[in-house]
Amino acid sequence: MEQNKIEKMLGKIDFAEFGTLRDYPFLIGLQLGFSMNGGGYAVCDGGKFTVNISKECKWESQTREAAVTASLERVEEILKAAKVNYVSELVGKPVEVTLVNSAFKDFRILTEVL
């Protein structure tokens, strides 16, 4: 059995947007892009912080509300950690990005250097 390769890389947020995904307009939320190694390596969040708002999605009412609330609470946590008020102000903030098998897993704002 092959082990997952976990990497933690230092970098910065290259883009930060809140809205729908271009190719998947039923997904809405925060979308982030990161660059590491002085811009030599880039990765996106893959829609990790989005929620399916499609009418065809078979949500239980409370489950949908909980998912939307959790998504917005995550945005609030990120903004607070970065000490900003707007998503656009996240661009340029220092981060530690966690990759598993070279795919985005998670990130954290490097609050210790802000």
Protein language model features and the residues they cover:
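Short beta-rich binding modules
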Residues: 1-114
